[in-house]
């Protein structure tokens, strides 16, 4: 088992939830945390613990974004007008690797980050290899023609169980996608409940 898969399993077990909705998640078999003390009954979690858990879950879902980068998203979310929690979700869903994942060009957020890093994606006709690149409404994302027959792409395009959300229009023949709008929390197809307002509270302490 690779270190990346082990890390995913560990996060699922720590949260007690199947964060990415994976069939092979260990919480499908058991619902306690990792390690020899994982089966101990846990007491009531403090407000701080609840907020920390919400942050770890959201941060982990997007491929374990670095703490420094996640703090920048928080700072931008509270600077923007409107609900800060909704703003945070919008910023995360605007990440190029998130759009690549949502468009079903690859199977996981981790694969999406690597796919972008390796230069397989264009935005508005120009190659972009920065996973955190912020996509705008109306931008067109496409898989480079030379990359369209890679096994990782072919397999992902056949995943019937994961629908493309309404805020992205995808042409799987051309392997291109267009972001029609920036989504709110209720529109994002998370496999588990995300609580961005608790994340905002965590950083606002």
Curated annotation (Swiss-Prot):
| SUPFAM superfamilies, per the entry | Alpha-L RNA-binding motif
Q: Where is this region: Disordered?
A: 1-49
- Entry's Gene Ontology BP terms: ribosomal small subunit biogenesis; translation
Which residue numbers delimit the S4 RNA-binding domain?
94-155
Basic residues: bias regions: 1-12
Task: Name the PROSITE patterns for this protein.
Answer: RIBOSOMAL_S4, S4
Keyword annotations for this protein, in alphabetical order, are: Ribonucleoprotein, Ribosomal protein, RNA-binding, rRNA-binding
Q: What SMART domains does the record point to?
A: Ribosomal_S4, S4
Which GO-annotated molecular functions does the record name? rRNA binding; structural constituent of ribosome
Q: Name one Pfam family in it.
A: S4
Q: Name one GO cellular component term.
A: small ribosomal subunit
Q: What HAMAP family does the record point to?
A: Ribosomal_uS4_B
How is the quaternary structure described? Part of the 30S ribosomal subunit. Contacts protein S5. The interaction surface between S4 and S5 is involved in control of translational fidelity.
Family statement drawn from the similarity comment of this UniProt entry: Belongs to the universal ribosomal protein uS4 family.
Function according to Swiss-Prot or TrEMBL: One of the primary rRNA binding proteins, it binds directly to 16S rRNA where it nucleates assembly of the body of the 30S subunit. With S5 and S12 plays an important role in translational accuracy.
Cite the NCBIfam families for this sequence: PRK05327.1, rpsD_bact
Q: What is this protein called?
A: Small ribosomal subunit protein uS4
Q: Which organism is it from?
A: Methylorubrum populi (strain ATCC BAA-705 / NCIMB 13946 / BJ001)
């Amino acid at each position: 088992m690779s270190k990346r898969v082990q890390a995913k399993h560990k996060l699922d077990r720590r949260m007690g939830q199947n964060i990415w909705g994976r069939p092979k998640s260990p919480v499908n078999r058991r619902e306690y945390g990792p390690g020899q003390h994982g089966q101990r009954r846990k007491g009531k979690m403090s407000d701080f613990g609840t907020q920390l858990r919400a942050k770890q879950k959201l941060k982990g879902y997007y491929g374990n974004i670095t703490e420094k980068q996640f703090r920048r998203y928080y700072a931008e979310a509270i600077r923007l007008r409107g609900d800060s929690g909704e703003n945070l979700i919008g910023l995360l869903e605007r990440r190029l690797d998130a759009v690549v994942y949502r468009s079903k060009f690859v199977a996981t957020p981790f694969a999406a980050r690597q796919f972008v890093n390796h230069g397989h994606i264009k935005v508005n006709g120009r190659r972009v290899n920065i996973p955190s690149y912020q996509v705008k409404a109306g931008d067109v994302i496409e898989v480079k023609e030379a990359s369209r027959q890679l096994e990782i792409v072919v397999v992902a395009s056949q995943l019937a169980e994961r629908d493309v959300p309404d805020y992205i229009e995808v042409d799987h023949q051309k392997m291109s996608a267009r972001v029609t709008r920036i989504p709110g929390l209720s529109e994002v197809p998370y496999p588990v409940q995300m609580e961005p307002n608790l994340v905002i509270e965590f950083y606002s302490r």
